[in-house]
Regions:
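Acidic, Ser/Thr- and Pro/Gly-rich low-complexity regulatory segments
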Residues: 1-386, 413, 417-424
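Membrane-interface recognition of transmembrane alpha-helix starts
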Residues: 374-410
Length: 424
């Protein structure tokens, strides 16, 4: 290789090394990987609003840009402020820190980036405030005139690529809060999107998380996270059978009244599972929770991933979904059992047993039950004969013939014995 080429390579590598040393080691807002996105790309895209830089400028999201400016204006008017200067100054002071939170170089100049932080951050806070306080709403505000728009916005705030660093939200909230408000005040509306999955939620304190999606995830998982459900083992956890297969092995399914969706128990040959509502928001919300766990929780706290893996083991077909629905475990508002199967099957793609799998104890106990010889024999008998009415009829007929043959033989022996006694 010639010396000039060597010099150009050296220069190029040195530039890469310098860029690497100045880059954040752990960005907190990332784009979803190709593998995760491939199963359902729409689940990771906002519907109507871009928050943060990743989806900024998309044509289909432009209508909401004017509402960001309107909400900032209404905020300033409510606070009797004529200028946004102090907020711009605050955003400039943390611009560099905010840039390092994103997993790629943001191609905005300094002014554009600061403007985005301010408009997006204030919109998020004002929308959540107005969601709580009707007195803050403008009577002509279409966002609160049409309920479906609120639903879209709540959805978009739970998209992993559509986030701002939480310290931006926290700073702007504290700069604009009223006396009776704390940060819990604006978190509560975000919990409503998952209220059908996590019905009983109390916010004692805001968990440390990089953004709003992470906070909502951690709140929903908090009660379950305190329980050590996994077992340390040198062996890999084996999958359990489908719901139909477990039923054939003598395992019953019961609806649980636990507060947390994730609190599954196995006792006295019964799996107790809380109700899971399958709706039009299920797949998107759970996919973004799974993506958050994939990137940010390391080997711990993969509770949503573990739960989806568990349910994906149980539901291998629409028949499994039907069995769980009939036992009150699945609440289906999408349509038929085939839709439930499709959603859970799709959610289960690219999910794996985590290092500290939340349900390893349950899997171990269930597989122990199903592995006993008498249970294996019963499974084979049920699968081979009792699932087919004609096969069952044949078995019963054969048993009847056997009993009849035994009776005839017994009668013949007794008759012969009686005749011998008579002759003697």
């Amino acid at each position: 290789m010639s010396e000039p080429n060597a010099d150009s390579v050296t220069i190029h590598i040195d530039n890469m090394l310098r860029a690497l040393s100045s880059a954040p080691s752990e960005p907190t807002i990332l784009r979803v990987s190709v593998q995760l996105r491939s199963t359902n790309p729409k689940a990771y895209d906002p519907e109507i609003i871009a928050i943060g830089p990743f989806h900024h400028g998309k044509v289909q999201l432009q209508n909401m840009e004017q509402h960001k400016v309107k909400y900032l204006k209404q905020l300033l008017q409510r606070r009797n402020e004529s200028s946004a200067e102090r907020y711009v100054i605050a955003m400039r002071e943390i611009e560099d820190r905010a840039r390092k939170c994103f997993g790629e170089a943001i191609q905005f100049n300094r002014d554009k980036f600061v403007e985005m932080l301010l408009l997006d951050g204030c919109f998020v806070i004002e929308f959540l405030r107005k969601f709580q306080e009707k007195d803050f709403r403008d009577k002509d505000d279409p966002i609160f005139r049409y309920r479906h728009i609120q639903g879209y916005l709540l959805h978009d705030l739970m998209v992993i690529e559509n986030q701002l660093p939480f310290f931006i939200i926290d700073l702007l909230f504290n700069m604009t809060k009223m006396d009776h408000q704390d940060i819990n005040y604006i978190i509560w509306p975000l919990l409503q999107i998952g209220r059908s999955f996590f019905p009983k939620i109390d916010i004692h304190e805001i968990p440390e998380a990089p953004h709003l999606l992470g906070i909502v995830h951690d709140i929903h998982c908090s009660s379950f996270a305190e329980i050590k459900y996994y077992i340390e083992s040198e062996y890999n956890t084996e999958k359990i059978d489908s719901a139909i297969g477990l039923q054939e092995a003598g395992i019953m399914f019961r609806k649980s009244e636990e507060n947390s969706l994730f609190h599954i128990k196995f006792k006295n040959k019964a799996l107790s599972i809380p109700v899971w509502e399958i709706s039009d928001v299920t797949e998107s919300l759970f996919r973004n929770f799974i993506a958050y766990e994939y990137y940010f929780t390391g080997s711990n706290k993969k509770h949503v991933t573990d739960y989806v893996f568990f349910m994906n083991c149980l539901i291998h077909s629409p028949k499994d979904a039907k069995l769980l629905r009939r036992n009150g475990i699945i609440s289906n508002i999408l349509g038929g059992d085939d839709m439930v199967y499709r959603v859970i099957n799709q959610l289960g793609k690219n999910t794996f047993i985590s290092e500290k799998f939340s349900y390893s104890k349950i899997f171990h106990a269930v597989n122990n039950h199903c592995g006993r010889k008498r249970n294996e024999w019963m499974v084979k008998l049920r699968r081979g004969y009792f699932n087919n009415p004609w096969a069952l009829f044949s078995v019963l007929a054969a048993i009847s013939m056997l009993l009849l043959s035994i009776a005839q033989t017994t009668f013949a022996v007794l008759s012969y014995s009686h005749d011998l006694k008579k002759d003697s």
